[in-house]
Amino acid sequence: MTVYAVTGGAEFLGRYIVKLLISADDVQEIRVINVVEDPQPLVSKVKVINYIQCDINDLIR
């Protein structure tokens, strides 16, 4: 099972990367990490997409 985490996944470039991962065959799960909640979360019928709202800078303090 291949799991990818995309930081900034609700922003312009991050959303594009998530869309590319959705279309990839070997991806089972995508974890989208972003500071703010995504107003229009992406949905896929064949991939598991988990949205995690946090600031990664808070994890290293």
From Swiss-Prot:
Matches recorded under InterPro entries: 3Beta_OHSteriod_DH/Estase, NAD(P)-bd_dom_sf
Biological process annotations from GO: steroid biosynthetic process
- Specify one Pfam family: 3Beta_HSD
Which Gene Ontology terms cover its molecular function? oxidoreductase activity, acting on the CH-OH group of donors, NAD or NADP as acceptor
Q: Which family does it belong to?
A: Belongs to the 3-beta-HSD family.
What free text does the record give on domains?
Answer: Corresponds to the N-terminal domain of vaccinia virus 3-beta-HSD.
Q: Tell me the protein's name.
A: Truncated 3-beta hydroxy-5-ene steroid dehydrogenase homolog
Species in which this protein is naturally found: Variola virus (isolate Human/India/Ind3/1967)
